[in-house]
């Protein structure tokens, strides 16, 4: 396996800067608001709703402008551009918890959590096969090429609003928090929790992640019904599903797919 040094260096830098952000001189109510606002914007609307349920699984439809807005929020999470994220996720579902799964939990907890992305990912060679709907869209190709650069205008905006404190809390600390929240679905939610449904893999329903990861923690439900826009079943809290319902009421979401 070939080490992905750009990814390793970037991740180390973000984690080091996240530690800097936690120094007392950077604390204020303002930075907390910025942190949570951008975490929900990029982690919930961007990754969970946009990258995952909308683009990866096509669990519902939105107007093109809104789909691209959610994809842009996802790109601001710096968890790959939409094409690579969707490619890896579709490969994960195709080979869940087998040797061909990019983040196979059977290779170890830390491999599934983040180790897999520190080496070359064979699935990314199949972008045109696994994500043809995105590859042929010029805007998604643009995000694929430039998603990391989106942190630059965001950083300038944050600096103009609150100096380095806003930058540190709004970019590296927020990125690291959303990273680990997403990664926990690949690791924690394939290790600890309940399996009420037969999904044919190690996916688990983890109530803690169900709440703090915007509904993604109901992971056994998801693997049993991957094309469903609703992951929390029978009263399980699923923030992303409530947002999709709101979009439907506003006439901005349709063809919503539910568990069979």
Predicted regions and their residues:
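Non-catalytic, topology-defining segments of multipass membrane proteins
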Residues: 1-184, 228-260
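Catalytic glutamate of the conserved HExxH
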Residues: 53, 187, 191, 223
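Active-site-proximal inter-transmembrane loops
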Residues: 73, 131-138, 192-218, 222-225
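C-terminal accessory segments of proteins
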Residues: 181-196
């Amino acid at each position: 396996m070939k080490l992905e040094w750009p990814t390793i260096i970037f991740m180390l830098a973000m984690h080091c800067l996240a530690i800097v952000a936690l120094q007392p001189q950077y604390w204020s109510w303002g930075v907390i608001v910025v942190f949570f606002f951008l975490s929900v914007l990029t982690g919930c609307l961007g990754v969970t709703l946009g990258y995952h349920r909308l683009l990866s699984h096509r669990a519902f439809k939105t107007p093109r402008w809104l789909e691209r807005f959610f994809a842009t929020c996802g790109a601001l999470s710096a968890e790959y551009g939409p094409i690579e994220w969707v490619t890896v996720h579709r490969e994960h579902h195709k080979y869940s918890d087998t040797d061909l799964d990019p983040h196979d939990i059977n290779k170890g907890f830390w491999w599934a959590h983040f180790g897999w992305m520190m080496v070359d990912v064979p699935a990314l060679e199949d972008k045109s096969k696994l994500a043809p709907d995105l590859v042929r869209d010029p805007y998604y190709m643009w995000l694929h090429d430039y998603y990391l650069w989106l942190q630059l205008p965001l950083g300038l905006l944050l600096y103009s609003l609150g100096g380095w404190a806003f930058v540190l809390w709004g970019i590296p600390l927020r990125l690291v928090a959303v990273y680990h929240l997403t990664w926990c679905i690949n690791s924690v939610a394939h290790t600890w929790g309940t399996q009420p449904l037969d999904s044919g893999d190690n996916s688990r329903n983890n109530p803690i992640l169900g709440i703090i990861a915007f509904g993604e923690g109901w992971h056994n439900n998801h693997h049993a019904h991957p094309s469903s826009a609703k992951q929390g079943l029978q009263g399980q809290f699923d923030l992303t599903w409530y947002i999709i319902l709101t979009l439907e009421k506003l006439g901005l979401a349709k063809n919503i797919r539910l568990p069979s």
